[in-house]
């Protein structure tokens, strides 16, 4: 049964009948609400996720993303931008900035794809330059 369903879905994807993604141009944000790992993630994250959804933002509750001490933590996709200490009041400005191609500086913790030292370097450089465009800086290499 599972094999036939899986085969059917794969055939439909390959034929183009079903798109691989229906993601639109609007950002998708994940809010850590993992209360079993650390209660503050649920206590601080759930109100943020609820506020964003009520405002029409595609906001998902997710499991642990690291940095409990920064709860509520938000990850903005597709760029994988981490923000910490997000509140319901600060959540919408963060999402609106991201939708406009900018990184909201308050609580910015770096990019998921980069190691912690590179994340810190990006944060310091952005503050120094005052440059907050998502695509404004390019990482060419790191050690």
For each predicted feature, which ranges?
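Histidine/cysteine-enriched polar flanking segments
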Residues: 1-143
